[in-house]
Each structure stands twice: as C-alpha cells, then as structure tokens.
C-alpha cells in the first residue's frame, strides 16, 4: 500500500471515529478518559497540533467544533452530565 492511500484510509478512520463520538453523546469525556486515556478534547488538541505542524493555524474552539460537531459550550450545556 502506498503512503497516499494509507493516509487517506487513516483520515477516513479518524473521521469515522469523530462521527461515532458525535452520535454517542451519552458517552462522557470523563468515561472515555478513564477507560481509554483520551477524550474528545484530546482529539481536538491533537487535530490542532497536527495542523500547526503543517503550518495551519486552527483555534482551539474551531478544533473542538470539528470534533464535537457544534461549539463546545453548546455541547457541554446539552450533553455533559
């Protein structure tokens, strides 16, 4: 498998994970952190850091919006227990 295909597959898997977490609003970040060692906020931080490595500036709120599918404060009000 060449690197381009590998990167495309990895990107698709990441987006699928993000979509899965958007659909599973019942799963709290604290539960994810306790069980898996990462949460939605970690994913948004990693997304922002990888963008920075490529010379792309993404704000923390924009990175979180990508992961949560809505502004973070809105998600917290609606779904955080």
Identify what each model region corresponds to.
Residues 1-81:
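Domain-level signature for proteins that mediate thiol-based redox and metal-cofactor handling
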